[in-house]
Amino acid sequence: MADSITTIVTALGFPSIESFIGVLLLGGAIIGAIVVIATIRPILDLFPFAYPNARVRARIGRLLNEKQLSEILETESMEEFKNYLRGLPDYAKYIDRFPIEKALESQLAETYEMVSQIAPASIRDPFRANLKRWDVRNIKSLITAKAAGLSAEETVNLLVPGGEVYEIIEGLADASSVQEVVTGLEATEYAGVLEDALSGYEETGMLLPIEAALDRKFLEGLIRTVGSPSDDNTKILHTYFGTMVDISNLKIILRAKADGLSYDDISPYIVPHGYQIREWKLKDLMESEDVSGVVSGLEGTDYGQMLSEALSEYTSTGSVAVFERVLEDNLNRMARNFALKKPFGVGPMIGFLSRKEVEVKNLKVIARSKREPGFPEAMVKEMLA
């Protein structure tokens, strides 16, 4: 028997049984290693998200529930509204420091900063790029204030601590003109787009060229930072931020068509790097005759049906805000779905930021109702997201 085994082993090219056994053991070890790696790899991929998502879930637990929102809605004055928020850890430290809208948005900016700091290294860059929304928001507020002739104190009250160049922007609160603001920002990454758009403002007296140029720079930078999707998490980011671009483009086109503007009027403000709507489709939409043409041109996309369902309300009200609300609701649903679809990855972070945005938006609506006596309660409830 032993001789037969030796003969077989020799026929296979092995000099001895010992060498054959050694090869078998080595092969088993390699197979075992492959199995271990295949088993551990998913766990290793999830590990960087464990701490960030634990932090995020703790914050999700502090979001306002329906009962709390109803109680806030039932407050009878601005002071009572503020008193309620003083009892909430997330808002308490801001309520007595800033005017109410600035207080609410300051908490939102802090939330964005927190998420960007704890995001795993593999996806941190897009979250850092997303913080620049506060630079753009503050520059818009600054130039609006200067165009309106507001004082330095009034201007500062419009600025939210956040972004990368807040100190520079705040330092320009006493600027006397939009042109002086543009000059004061020449050392920032926004200098080029502001200088290019300034002539449009000087020719028309409208801030739209500057505001749209800032939006375009922000969105293009965000998409560029996400880059090409390489795994499930970056695919989600690419889809989500790409959808943000789609929605921004659609808002611009719908408003432009409601105002009777042409392709040449619209095209400088469009970002050609969205998720579903390609450049050729954007061109077709910009060349549409009217709002109805834009909606019908979206047939075959996710946006087509939802905007078609809102078309009758637009026809009766004449306000494109109905479309904007539908588009924003769609983005919020997408964020919630990602939180469920990728609960151990980037999903909870996107879902949380979206829900926080909605919370702050709702609080700003309620704050407005407390500030303006006689604001209809039915209108408030209709405006809540």
UniProtKB/Swiss-Prot annotation:
User: How does the protein's chain sit in the membrane according to the entry?
Assistant: Peripheral membrane protein
Output one GO BP term.
proton motive force-driven plasma membrane ATP synthesis
Query: Which compartments does it reside in?
Result: Cell membrane
Check the record and name the SUPFAM superfamilies matching this protein: V-type ATP synthase subunit C
Q: Return the Gene3D superfamilies for the record.
A: ATP synthase (C/AC39) subunit, domain 3 (1.10.132.50), V-type ATP synthase subunit C domain (1.20.1690.10)
Any GO MF annotation of the entry:
proton-transporting ATPase activity, rotational mechanism
Give the keywords, sorted.
ATP synthesis, Cell membrane, Hydrogen ion transport, Ion transport, Membrane, Transport
The answer, when asked if Plastid is one of the entry's keywords, is: no
A Pfam family annotated for this chain is vATP-synt_AC39
Gene Ontology cellular component annotations, sorted alphabetically? plasma membrane; proton-transporting V-type ATPase, V0 domain
What is the role of the protein in this entry?
A: Component of the A-type ATP synthase that produces ATP from ADP in the presence of a proton gradient across the membrane.
Please state which protein family the record places this protein in. Belongs to the V-ATPase V0D/AC39 subunit family.
* HAMAP family, A to Z: ATP_synth_C_arch
The record describes its quaternary structure and partners as:
Has multiple subunits with at least A(3), B(3), C, D, E, F, H, I and proteolipid K(x).
Q: Kindly provide the name given to this protein in its UniProt entry.
A: A-type ATP synthase subunit C
- The species this protein was found in: Methanothermobacter thermautotrophicus (strain ATCC 29096 / DSM 1053 / JCM 10044 / NBRC 100330 / Delta H)
Q: Which gene encodes it?
A: atpC
